[in-house]
Amino acid sequence: MLELNKIYCGDCLDLMREMPDKSVDLVLTDPPYGTTVCKWDIIVPFDPLWQQFNRILKPGAVSVITGTQPFTSLIINSNFENFRYIWYWEKEKGVGFQNANRQPMRIFEDCCVFYKNLPKYHPPKQPLRKRRIRRHTDSNTKSESCHMESRNYVNKTIKYDFETPINCLHFPRETQIGENYHPTQKPIALFEYLIQTYTEIGDTVLDPFMGSGTTCVACVKTGRNYIGIDKEPAYVEIARKRLEKVNNTKLSEWF
């Protein structure tokens, strides 16, 4: 049986068989998209993957799987019955510069949400962005007020977060500040947001393609249990070092 708050090196399809039924609150993972020549970037068969997810997920649990096209279409169609919607992670800079003379650079990455039964859903507030605010005249009071596209008014100042999230999430990558561990690394803050949206403190999150361990780090920072799996020993070692660092940081905050 796989233990909580541990990471494992191996094939996730084999290791997940050691997990109990209905033991996971969230699967959050960034699997291989099959879009590069890297030896690890091979798409895992979807049928056995969903078979294990469906077995180990609790009722009302969620799977959030990142992707870009054409992988996004493949993963959605592999479980169309349980596909619900997409969060779009907006990057600071577009990618695909080598093809910029033939097609637009890509600035979004997808986070595909799957579930059977209505899950927990309490997304953290998102910061109010200037481009989403316009001037609005209230016909009853004849006075101007700030007005959001969601038609919720903002009182007096615009420094407050808005309560209804949009499906576009903007989080900077740690690679911009020198913390580059993996070629497809996602921001810790992005995964913290998704973890907080679909789980509560003490819940269990599985990442069967953990890479350099971003999901596990985000779990530690948000008070969730994690299980991480990856078949590449080098990245498992990187993940261990990152977890040691974040655990030591949390320990120092207590004293």
Per-segment meaning from a language model:
Residues M1-I229, A234-I238:
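Core catalytic lobe of class I
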Residues M1-L2, R240-F255:
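Short, conserved SAM-binding/catalytic segment
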